[in-house]
Amino acid sequence: MKVILREDFINLGKEGDIVDVKDGFARNYLLPKGFAVFSNKHNIDIFSQKKRAILKRQETRRKMAVELKEKLDKVNLEFIMQSNDSGKLFHSINSSNIADELLKLGFEIERRKIDMHHGALKAFGTYNVTIKLYEGISSVITVEIKREEKKNSLKKSKSVEKEV
């Protein structure tokens, strides 16, 4: 089925592009969520009239993505996580956690634009995570997972008091 995209869609096309997708994907996802419209003569005429505005909007998005990339390249996220005695994390870090931390820093990034090369981060260490901002423009941020310090010294002092 041919549809016209109403907004940029990763791995599919840009706003105003006519793309051929499977019928189920169009009927069950793209059309109900408003990401696309049917490709018929009427809609093609409407989008051809809007083409200049679409191109201007795409150029604005590209400029904003370049500015955002410059800011994001300086970002280092740090997660302090709990683990068991063998060093395994109780909770892994996924794209939602990273998007939430970026939001706290003032960056509104959609979760689907965060590319986790390694899948969810399940061990302590430093990782590079790619954020796809716009076609051909992406930023790499550093995510560091550190161990939360346990309060063993507090437990030891309590046990000494009980013995006395």
Swiss-Prot record:
In terms of InterPro entries, this protein maps to:
Ribosomal_bL9, Ribosomal_bL9/RNase_H1_N, Ribosomal_bL9_bac/chp, Ribosomal_bL9_C, Ribosomal_bL9_C_sf, Ribosomal_bL9_N, Ribosomal_bL9_N_sf
Keyword Ribonucleoprotein in record: yes
Instruction: Output the Gene Ontology terms for molecular function.
Output: rRNA binding; structural constituent of ribosome
Question: Which Pfam family, an example, fits this chain?
Answer: Ribosomal_L9_N
Q: Name one GO cellular component term.
A: ribonucleoprotein complex
SUPFAM superfamilies reported for this sequence: L9 N-domain-like, Ribosomal protein L9 C-domain
This protein's source sits in the domain of life called Bacteria
Tell me one GO biological process term: translation
Which keywords label this protein?
Answer: Ribonucleoprotein, Ribosomal protein, RNA-binding, rRNA-binding
What HAMAP family does the database record attribute to this sequence? Ribosomal_bL9
What exactly does this protein do? Answer: Binds to the 23S rRNA.
The record's similarity note reads: Belongs to the bacterial ribosomal protein bL9 family.
Q: What is this protein called?
A: Large ribosomal subunit protein bL9
Q: Which organism is it from?
A: Borrelia duttonii (strain Ly)
